[in-house]
Amino acid sequence: AGRIPGSFVRREARAGEQAILTCRLIDRPLRPCFPDGFRNEVHVVGTVLGADQENPYDVLALNAASAALCISDVPFDGPVGAVRIAWTADGEWIPFPTYAEGDESAFEMVVAGRELPDGDVAVMMVEAGGTGSSWELYENGTPKVDEEILAGGLEASKTWIKEMIALQRQLIDSVDVPAKIDPPVVVDYADAVFEAVRTAGWDKIVASQQIADKAERSAAEDAVKAEILAAVEPQFADEADATKQIKNAVRSLTKQAVRKRIVEDGVRIDGRGVRDLRQLSAEVGVIPTAHGSGLFQRGETQVLNFTTLGMGRSDLMVDDLSPVEKKRYMHHYNFPPFSTGETGFMRGPKRREIGHGALAERALFPVVPSFDDWPYTLRLVSEVLSSNGSTSMASVCGSTLSLMDAGVPIKAPVAGIAMGLVYAEGEYVTLTDILGAEDAYGDMDFKVAGTRDYITALQLDTKLDGVPASVLAQALTQAKDARNTLLDVMNEAIDSPDEMSLYAVSYTH
């Protein structure tokens, strides 16, 4: 790239934020393509050998990673194709935009998928968000990226995904691909153990998954597991790992119980229907000395967000391979272990925290005022105080609250919701506002953020081989209903930007 690193020693150090986000972008669509029970470590290294400062390299790296796995001896059900598309000022989706074209567009979206035997493309991963030009373009007549336009973008992406897959197949056909290894497949439990656990504890497992409160449900699960272990363990005394097998079988049956109730009865763990939201609350001005603060709670998920204002010298200097040199709007997300009732080291942000912070940052970016309208540096921090699913989307809601509490004239309030999916016997059941357990036992985590009129950010991960675009379109419509409900609750807490805090005024002037 023709750049000397900006660090003190002028040498590459650990992976920076952009590299971590690119790694996550690559990992997410590739992971479901490995066979069930495959536990061998696979290390895929993407090295940027050259960067022209015009074309993004992340999607190129994703396609390259898929191609590398396809021509290796690793069991991998590929290829996976990926494309970045942009919604232009003229209201068209264009593929593989340059950095400049992306900045001038209203919305960018990375879509990855696999080609099915019938020629269709199953979507495996989506990462999308509005740009700094979104609001101005919408004001000047560019069609807003709503659910319908986004669904059209998913359909449009299939053509270019197929082209990426075709290129990879050309590579596969041109080289001697070694035979795929037959790795040892880890079996979580023997059939006999599974049946013994089912006989001893199925009814108890089902009952434990009908307890709405997370702490009470967790205690009930531990009690049921202990009862099953006491009943079943003596039957397999000769098995070296009997305890582990029994615990794995209990988890598998728990997953079955949760999914069966959702598909057959339309009832979830906490008794909600598939479209129901948990209890909501929103509050601002929680910390008087903060420039802005917002507390958002959805069920047992609670996030406290802070906004801090600074002058230009507080901008973040960016030292990576992109053309961006500095950032005046930052969002940092912290997920301490106490938020899930656990202990652990707190040594700085992990990859997940960096990813969630970037998603929440992207969700608010289109509505943050430009430097000309608001000449301040903005740092937002989301502190997860309690977690039971969808803390990143709670961070989006908390961000809106704290920005308005700080007096930042955002273009419009933004809210976010996490959607889930259960697939069984050819039927897709979409869930609104998923719990942590529904994320773990379900087949999709689909996060959607936006205003009342348009979408500002979106992220999709799936454990399936892919999700039909029609199912995603329905999930988008369902998410909009939930988003509007969230915005109603937030509007009751604060309906317009407040006056700037005296603490902020004394600091910034």
Per-region residue spans from a language model:
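Alpha/propeptide regions of enzymes that mature by internal proteolysis
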Residues: 9, 13-35, 39-46, 55-75, ...
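Conserved helix-loop functional segments at active or binding sites
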Residues: 28-36, 71, 311, 336-341, ...
